[in-house]
From Swiss-Prot:
Keywords: Cell outer membrane, Membrane, Transmembrane, Transmembrane beta strand
Keyword field contains Membrane: yes
Major place of residence: membrane
Protein name: Opacity-related protein POPM3
Length: 170
């Protein structure tokens, strides 16, 4: 089955501070304003789309309602190359995501009739298998470093990224 072209992938990323000290140290010794930084990032991914709703007697949706709101969480590596201007930095980055699967099995039983010890049930079984892979993202970050006395240097930043998503329904 060909996946629809209109798939929206939104990701909220929280960078860990595990390896950010390497970038800070490189910029503090004033050898070069360029730096390379490795991060472990936490991603909370939500995949939605604009499939049509199955409304009306003659309109049926070809996509299960199960695939309308998929969520996943992952920890993945990210590498950045940036330039330090002194009080603020810019960086381009690449992140690689892990593959995750979504499988669902459901059974729905509805009693239709129960007369004279004769019971009629309607049983519906549904097996859905889908593989969604948020493969990678390319991003651009702008970071402002707060100047405080001491070793701890907080920062605030914003990141804009393009994410590549692949999915199939088995």
């Amino acid at each position: 089955i060909q996946p629809p072209k209109n798939l929206l992938f939104s990701s909220l990323l929280f960078s860990s501070l595990l390896f950010s000290s390497a970038a800070q140290a490189a910029s503090e010794d004033r050898r070069s304003p360029y730096y390379v930084q490795a991060d472990l990032a936490y991603a909370a991914e939500r995949i939605t789309h604009d499939y049509p709703q199955a409304t009306g007697a003659n309109n049926t949706s070809t996509v299960s309602d199960y695939f309308r709101n998929i969520r996943a969480h992952s920890i993945h590596p990210r590498v950045s190359v940036g330039y330090d201007f002194g009080g603020w930095r810019i960086a381009a980055d690449y992140a690689s995501y892990r593959k995750w699967n979504n499988n669902k099995y459901s059974v729905n039983t509805k009693e239709l009739e129960n007369k004279h010890n004769n019971k009629k049930d309607l049983k519906t079984e549904n097996q859905e298998n889908g593989t969604f892979h948020a493969a990678s993202s390319l991003g651009l970050s702008a970071i402002y470093d707060f100047k405080l006395k001491g070793k701890f240097k907080p920062y605030i930043g914003a990141r804009v990224a393009y994410g590549h998503v692949r999915h199939s329904i088995d």
